[in-house]
Amino acid sequence: MRNKGFTLIELMVVLVILGVLAAMIAPKIMDRPDEARIVAARQDIATVIQALKMYRLDNIRYPTTEQGLQALVTKPAIAPIPDNWKSGGYLEKLPKDPWGNAYVYLNPGRHGDIDVISLGTDGESGGEGKDADIGSWML
């Protein structure tokens, strides 16, 4: 008469199957945080671009590179001083990119009138794959 239960071989087969499944799924799960950070950076850049457009509507021009994105939070003290700067600013505070770095602002931009750039995972200009820059021209 056979006992009810699993043999050692049956348990080993199940463990091997679970191991194979884990090996296939783990890399996909591990890449998700980087993908989420890239999406968050794109959303931040889109928000900053909208604030820059509002600044331009009020002041005829975008802030200069020297004035930087800080011009969206506090009225610039560097020429050209905006005449119609909105009380309270255009952003409550400047966001940092998902890797903790400041966004780079260029006026004129290399890819359009203005560029807003996250330097990506490595925090350095350029790079490929996960280290690639994320820019406003990519939206």
Describe the residue ranges of each PLM region:
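Short, surface-exposed interaction loops/tails
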Residues: 31, 35-39, 50-53, 59, ...
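Acidic, glycine-rich loop-and-strand cores that form catalytic or ligand-binding grooves
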Residues: 69-87
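A generic structural-conservation signal
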Residues: 10, 65-66, 81
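Generic N-terminal leader/processing signal
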Residues: 1-2, 26, 35, 40
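N-terminal single-pass transmembrane signal-anchor helix
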Residues: 2-29
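Hydrophobic positions in long alpha-helices of the protein kinase catalytic C-lobe
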Residues: 41-45
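Compositionally biased, charge-rich terminal segments
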Residues: 57-59, 76-77
